Amino acid sequence: MTSVVELFASFAVTITAAPLARSWMLRQGCVDVPNYRSSHTVPTPRGGGVACLLGLCGALVVAATNARDVPWALVAASIALSLVGYADDQTDLSSGFRLAAQVLVGATMGVTLGGGWLIPVAAFVATAVVNMVNFMDGINGITSLSMTVWGAAAWIVGVLHDVRGLQLVGVAVVGCSLGFLPWNAPSARLFLGDVGSYLFGGLVASGLLLGLSGGAPLMPLVAPLVIYAADTSAALVRRVVRGEPLLHAHREHVYQRLVSTLGITHLAASTGVAVLSAVATVTWLWCDTVISVPVTALIVVLYLASPRLLSASHLWSVDVPKGLPR
Protein backbone atom coordinates (compact mmCIF):
# COMPACT_ATOMS: atom_id res chain seq x y z
CA MET A 1 0.00 0.00 0.00
CA THR A 2 2.87 2.35 0.79
CA SER A 3 4.21 1.90 -2.73
CA VAL A 4 0.86 3.01 -4.14
CA VAL A 5 0.95 6.19 -2.04
CA GLU A 6 4.54 6.88 -3.09
CA LEU A 7 3.55 6.37 -6.72
CA PHE A 8 0.62 8.75 -6.39
CA ALA A 9 2.71 11.35 -4.56
CA SER A 10 5.44 11.40 -7.19
CA PHE A 11 2.86 11.53 -9.99
CA ALA A 12 0.73 14.25 -8.42
CA VAL A 13 3.66 16.49 -7.51
CA THR A 14 5.27 16.11 -10.94
CA ILE A 15 2.16 16.83 -12.99
CA THR A 16 1.30 19.79 -10.75
CA ALA A 17 4.80 21.23 -10.76
CA ALA A 18 5.29 20.90 -14.53
CA PRO A 19 3.40 24.10 -15.51
CA LEU A 20 5.27 26.00 -12.80
CA ALA A 21 8.56 24.67 -14.15
CA ARG A 22 7.51 25.70 -17.64
CA SER A 23 6.76 29.26 -16.54
CA TRP A 24 10.05 29.46 -14.66
CA MET A 25 12.10 28.23 -17.59
CA LEU A 26 10.40 30.68 -19.95
CA ARG A 27 11.25 33.54 -17.60
CA GLN A 28 14.84 32.30 -17.44
CA GLY A 29 15.02 32.14 -21.23
CA CYS A 30 15.81 28.43 -20.99
CA VAL A 31 14.33 27.48 -24.37
CA ASP A 32 15.36 24.98 -27.02
CA VAL A 33 15.33 26.66 -30.43
CA PRO A 34 15.05 24.20 -33.35
CA ASN A 35 18.08 23.73 -35.57
CA TYR A 36 19.21 21.34 -38.30
CA ARG A 37 19.83 18.49 -35.84
CA SER A 38 16.60 18.94 -33.86
CA SER A 39 13.63 16.59 -34.02
CA HIS A 40 11.27 19.41 -33.07
CA THR A 41 10.05 22.43 -35.00
CA VAL A 42 8.74 24.77 -32.28
CA PRO A 43 10.81 26.64 -29.63
CA THR A 44 10.10 24.83 -26.37
CA PRO A 45 11.25 25.44 -22.78
CA ARG A 46 13.62 22.81 -21.42
CA GLY A 47 14.45 22.02 -17.80
CA GLY A 48 11.08 20.44 -17.06
CA GLY A 49 12.89 17.73 -15.18
CA VAL A 50 12.74 20.10 -12.21
CA ALA A 51 9.13 18.95 -11.84
CA CYS A 52 10.32 15.33 -11.73
CA LEU A 53 12.88 16.27 -9.09
CA LEU A 54 10.07 17.69 -6.96
CA GLY A 55 8.03 14.57 -7.66
CA LEU A 56 10.89 12.44 -6.35
CA CYS A 57 10.90 14.55 -3.19
CA GLY A 58 7.18 13.88 -2.81
CA ALA A 59 7.79 10.13 -2.88
CA LEU A 60 10.64 10.51 -0.39
CA VAL A 61 8.40 12.40 2.05
CA VAL A 62 5.84 9.60 1.94
CA ALA A 63 8.54 6.96 2.37
CA ALA A 64 10.14 8.74 5.32
CA THR A 65 6.76 9.31 6.96
CA ASN A 66 6.05 5.58 6.76
CA ALA A 67 9.52 4.63 8.04
CA ARG A 68 10.42 2.97 4.75
CA ASP A 69 13.96 1.96 3.88
CA VAL A 70 15.24 4.88 1.82
CA PRO A 71 18.63 4.64 0.06
CA TRP A 72 19.36 8.23 1.02
CA ALA A 73 22.95 8.34 -0.21
CA LEU A 74 22.08 7.03 -3.66
CA VAL A 75 19.05 9.30 -3.94
CA ALA A 76 21.20 12.27 -2.89
CA ALA A 77 23.72 11.32 -5.58
CA SER A 78 20.93 11.20 -8.17
CA ILE A 79 19.77 14.64 -7.06
CA ALA A 80 23.35 15.91 -7.32
CA LEU A 81 23.49 14.65 -10.90
CA SER A 82 20.22 16.41 -11.69
CA LEU A 83 21.66 19.66 -10.34
CA VAL A 84 24.61 19.27 -12.70
CA GLY A 85 22.07 18.82 -15.47
CA TYR A 86 20.18 21.92 -14.34
CA ALA A 87 23.38 23.95 -14.46
CA ASP A 88 24.02 22.65 -17.96
CA ASP A 89 20.51 23.62 -19.05
CA GLN A 90 21.15 27.13 -17.79
CA THR A 91 24.79 27.76 -18.69
CA ASP A 92 25.95 25.06 -21.14
CA LEU A 93 28.73 23.39 -19.13
CA SER A 94 31.76 21.97 -20.90
CA SER A 95 31.67 18.27 -21.77
CA GLY A 96 34.78 17.72 -19.66
CA PHE A 97 33.16 19.19 -16.56
CA ARG A 98 29.99 17.16 -17.06
CA LEU A 99 31.96 13.94 -17.48
CA ALA A 100 34.09 14.63 -14.41
CA ALA A 101 30.99 15.34 -12.33
CA GLN A 102 29.31 12.14 -13.49
CA VAL A 103 32.35 10.02 -12.67
CA LEU A 104 32.79 11.68 -9.27
CA VAL A 105 29.15 11.24 -8.27
CA GLY A 106 29.19 7.66 -9.53
CA ALA A 107 32.31 6.87 -7.52
CA THR A 108 30.60 8.36 -4.47
CA MET A 109 27.71 5.95 -5.03
CA GLY A 110 30.21 3.10 -4.89
CA VAL A 111 31.69 4.41 -1.65
CA THR A 112 28.26 4.54 0.01
CA LEU A 113 27.65 0.90 -0.94
CA GLY A 114 30.83 -0.32 0.72
CA GLY A 115 33.69 0.85 -1.46
CA GLY A 116 36.28 -1.48 -2.96
CA TRP A 117 35.44 -2.84 -6.40
CA LEU A 118 32.06 -1.11 -6.28
CA ILE A 119 33.71 2.31 -6.69
CA PRO A 120 34.90 1.88 -10.30
CA VAL A 121 31.81 -0.16 -11.16
CA ALA A 122 29.49 2.53 -9.83
CA ALA A 123 31.46 5.28 -11.55
CA PHE A 124 31.15 3.47 -14.87
CA VAL A 125 27.48 2.56 -14.43
CA ALA A 126 26.43 6.07 -13.42
CA THR A 127 28.35 7.74 -16.24
CA ALA A 128 27.17 5.27 -18.88
CA VAL A 129 23.50 5.32 -17.87
CA VAL A 130 23.27 9.09 -17.44
CA ASN A 131 24.72 9.70 -20.89
CA MET A 132 22.62 6.95 -22.44
CA VAL A 133 19.38 8.43 -21.11
CA ASN A 134 20.53 11.90 -22.12
CA PHE A 135 21.41 10.82 -25.67
CA MET A 136 18.09 9.03 -26.13
CA ASP A 137 15.93 11.91 -24.89
CA GLY A 138 15.38 13.29 -28.38
CA ILE A 139 11.68 12.90 -29.24
CA ASN A 140 8.42 13.41 -27.40
CA GLY A 141 7.56 10.82 -24.79
CA ILE A 142 10.51 8.49 -25.26
CA THR A 143 12.06 9.02 -21.83
CA SER A 144 8.77 9.06 -19.92
CA LEU A 145 7.54 5.83 -21.53
CA SER A 146 10.86 3.98 -21.36
CA MET A 147 11.47 5.03 -17.76
CA THR A 148 7.98 3.84 -16.86
CA VAL A 149 8.94 0.39 -18.13
CA TRP A 150 12.21 0.45 -16.19
CA GLY A 151 10.54 1.69 -13.00
CA ALA A 152 7.89 -1.02 -13.14
CA ALA A 153 10.59 -3.66 -13.62
CA ALA A 154 12.58 -2.24 -10.71
CA TRP A 155 9.57 -2.35 -8.42
CA ILE A 156 8.76 -5.95 -9.40
CA VAL A 157 12.36 -7.07 -8.85
CA GLY A 158 12.45 -5.22 -5.54
CA VAL A 159 9.29 -6.97 -4.36
CA LEU A 160 10.30 -10.43 -5.58
CA HIS A 161 13.74 -10.23 -3.96
CA ASP A 162 12.92 -7.98 -0.99
CA VAL A 163 15.18 -5.10 -2.01
CA ARG A 164 13.11 -2.34 -0.47
CA GLY A 165 15.19 0.59 -1.63
CA LEU A 166 14.74 -0.66 -5.18
CA GLN A 167 10.98 -0.73 -4.69
CA LEU A 168 11.00 2.95 -3.75
CA VAL A 169 13.25 3.96 -6.63
CA GLY A 170 11.03 2.03 -9.04
CA VAL A 171 7.71 3.59 -8.01
CA ALA A 172 9.25 7.07 -7.87
CA VAL A 173 10.56 6.70 -11.43
CA VAL A 174 7.15 5.48 -12.66
CA GLY A 175 5.27 8.29 -10.91
CA CYS A 176 7.59 11.03 -12.14
CA SER A 177 7.58 9.63 -15.68
CA LEU A 178 3.80 9.40 -15.93
CA GLY A 179 3.38 12.81 -14.32
CA PHE A 180 5.64 14.43 -16.89
CA LEU A 181 4.28 12.55 -19.92
CA PRO A 182 1.20 14.76 -20.61
CA TRP A 183 3.49 17.79 -20.80
CA ASN A 184 5.82 16.13 -23.29
CA ALA A 185 3.56 14.08 -25.58
CA PRO A 186 1.99 13.83 -28.05
CA SER A 187 3.24 17.37 -28.69
CA ALA A 188 5.68 18.93 -26.26
CA ARG A 189 4.94 21.94 -24.12
CA LEU A 190 8.02 21.20 -22.04
CA PHE A 191 11.26 19.24 -22.40
CA LEU A 192 12.94 17.31 -19.58
CA GLY A 193 16.27 18.95 -20.28
CA ASP A 194 19.50 17.67 -18.79
CA VAL A 195 18.12 18.16 -15.28
CA GLY A 196 15.53 15.48 -16.05
CA SER A 197 17.64 13.06 -18.07
CA TYR A 198 20.44 13.24 -15.48
CA LEU A 199 17.93 12.62 -12.69
CA PHE A 200 16.45 9.57 -14.38
CA GLY A 201 19.91 8.34 -15.32
CA GLY A 202 21.03 8.68 -11.71
CA LEU A 203 17.97 6.86 -10.40
CA VAL A 204 18.38 4.02 -12.89
CA ALA A 205 22.05 3.72 -11.97
CA SER A 206 21.04 3.69 -8.29
CA GLY A 207 18.54 0.93 -8.99
CA LEU A 208 21.12 -1.18 -10.80
CA LEU A 209 23.57 -0.76 -7.94
CA LEU A 210 20.90 -1.55 -5.35
CA GLY A 211 20.03 -4.71 -7.23
CA LEU A 212 23.69 -5.68 -7.52
CA SER A 213 24.44 -5.09 -3.84
CA GLY A 214 21.14 -6.64 -2.74
CA GLY A 215 21.63 -9.92 -4.58
CA ALA A 216 18.78 -9.41 -7.06
CA PRO A 217 19.11 -10.63 -10.65
CA LEU A 218 20.42 -7.82 -12.83
CA MET A 219 19.05 -8.78 -16.24
CA PRO A 220 15.43 -7.80 -15.47
CA LEU A 221 16.82 -4.37 -14.55
CA VAL A 222 19.06 -4.20 -17.61
CA ALA A 223 16.50 -5.52 -20.10
CA PRO A 224 14.42 -2.29 -20.18
CA LEU A 225 17.60 -0.52 -21.31
CA VAL A 226 18.62 -2.83 -24.16
CA ILE A 227 17.09 -0.62 -26.85
CA TYR A 228 18.74 2.45 -25.33
CA ALA A 229 22.10 0.68 -25.15
CA ALA A 230 21.88 -0.71 -28.68
CA ASP A 231 20.79 2.57 -30.26
CA THR A 232 23.42 4.62 -28.41
CA SER A 233 26.19 2.13 -29.19
CA ALA A 234 25.26 1.93 -32.87
CA ALA A 235 25.23 5.72 -33.20
CA LEU A 236 28.61 6.04 -31.49
CA VAL A 237 30.15 3.31 -33.66
CA ARG A 238 28.95 5.04 -36.82
CA ARG A 239 30.54 8.29 -35.68
CA VAL A 240 33.82 6.58 -34.78
CA VAL A 241 33.97 4.91 -38.19
CA ARG A 242 33.46 8.27 -39.87
CA GLY A 243 35.92 10.03 -37.57
CA GLU A 244 33.28 12.43 -36.22
CA PRO A 245 33.25 13.90 -32.67
CA LEU A 246 31.42 11.56 -30.31
CA LEU A 247 29.85 14.20 -28.10
CA HIS A 248 28.48 16.51 -30.79
CA ALA A 249 24.70 16.49 -31.15
CA HIS A 250 23.32 14.64 -34.16
CA ARG A 251 20.25 12.95 -35.64
CA GLU A 252 21.63 9.47 -36.23
CA HIS A 253 19.76 7.50 -33.59
CA VAL A 254 17.34 4.92 -34.93
CA TYR A 255 14.35 6.61 -33.30
CA GLN A 256 15.33 9.93 -34.91
CA ARG A 257 15.54 8.31 -38.34
CA LEU A 258 12.13 6.72 -37.85
CA VAL A 259 10.67 10.19 -37.29
CA SER A 260 12.68 12.32 -39.71
CA THR A 261 12.96 9.88 -42.62
CA LEU A 262 9.84 7.73 -42.42
CA GLY A 263 7.47 10.32 -40.96
CA ILE A 264 6.46 8.17 -37.99
CA THR A 265 5.05 10.33 -35.20
CA HIS A 266 7.10 11.00 -32.10
CA LEU A 267 4.61 9.20 -29.89
CA ALA A 268 4.45 6.15 -32.17
CA ALA A 269 8.24 5.82 -32.24
CA SER A 270 8.47 6.33 -28.47
CA THR A 271 5.74 3.78 -27.84
CA GLY A 272 7.50 1.29 -30.09
CA VAL A 273 10.71 1.65 -28.11
CA ALA A 274 8.84 1.21 -24.82
CA VAL A 275 6.88 -1.83 -26.03
CA LEU A 276 9.99 -3.59 -27.30
CA SER A 277 11.74 -2.81 -24.01
CA ALA A 278 8.77 -4.17 -22.07
CA VAL A 279 8.74 -7.42 -24.07
CA ALA A 280 12.44 -7.95 -23.40
CA THR A 281 11.87 -7.20 -19.72
CA VAL A 282 8.99 -9.65 -19.37
CA THR A 283 11.08 -12.46 -20.82
CA TRP A 284 13.83 -11.84 -18.27
CA LEU A 285 11.34 -11.62 -15.40
CA TRP A 286 9.38 -14.78 -16.10
CA CYS A 287 11.07 -16.90 -18.78
CA ASP A 288 14.12 -19.15 -18.87
CA THR A 289 17.39 -17.84 -20.26
CA VAL A 290 17.02 -20.13 -23.26
CA ILE A 291 14.04 -17.96 -24.26
CA SER A 292 15.17 -14.59 -22.91
CA VAL A 293 18.49 -14.41 -24.74
CA PRO A 294 17.24 -15.07 -28.30
CA VAL A 295 14.13 -12.93 -27.81
CA THR A 296 16.21 -10.00 -26.58
CA ALA A 297 18.71 -10.42 -29.41
CA LEU A 298 15.88 -10.53 -31.96
CA ILE A 299 14.34 -7.37 -30.48
CA VAL A 300 17.64 -5.51 -30.74
CA VAL A 301 18.24 -6.62 -34.34
CA LEU A 302 14.71 -5.74 -35.44
CA TYR A 303 14.90 -2.33 -33.79
CA LEU A 304 18.25 -1.41 -35.30
CA ALA A 305 17.04 -2.55 -38.72
CA SER A 306 13.58 -1.00 -38.41
CA PRO A 307 14.21 2.13 -40.54
CA ARG A 308 15.40 -0.03 -43.44
CA LEU A 309 12.74 -2.70 -42.95
CA LEU A 310 9.87 -0.24 -42.75
CA SER A 311 11.14 1.74 -45.71
CA ALA A 312 11.51 -1.40 -47.83
CA SER A 313 8.03 -2.60 -46.87
CA HIS A 314 6.49 0.70 -48.06
CA LEU A 315 4.36 0.85 -44.93
CA TRP A 316 5.30 4.52 -44.69
CA SER A 317 5.48 6.75 -47.73
CA VAL A 318 7.35 10.00 -48.21
CA ASP A 319 3.99 11.81 -48.22
CA VAL A 320 3.44 11.08 -44.53
CA PRO A 321 3.96 14.25 -42.44
CA LYS A 322 7.29 14.25 -40.66
CA GLY A 323 6.01 13.49 -37.17
CA LEU A 324 4.34 15.82 -34.73
CA PRO A 325 6.05 19.09 -33.89
CA ARG A 326 7.85 19.09 -30.58
What are these regions (language model features)?
Residues 69-82, 86, 91-93, 242-243, ...:
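Hydrophobic alpha-helical transmembrane segments and immediately flanking/interface helices
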Residues 116-117, 190, 245, 266, ...:
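Secondary-structure boundary/capping signal
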Residues 98, 121-124, 169, 246-248, ...:
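Short alpha-helical linear motifs
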Residues 259-323:
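C-terminal membrane module of polytopic membrane proteins
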Residues 215-219, 236, 248-249, 267, ...:
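Extended hydrophobic-aromatic, low-complexity segments
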Residues 19-45, 234-267, 317-324:
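Cytosolic, membrane-interface loops and tails of multi-pass inner-membrane proteins
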Residues 1-232:
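"…together with the soluble PPM/PP2C metallo-phosphatase catalytic core" -> "…together
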Residues 1-9, 315-326:
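Short, low-complexity, intrinsically disordered N-terminal peptides in bacterial proteins
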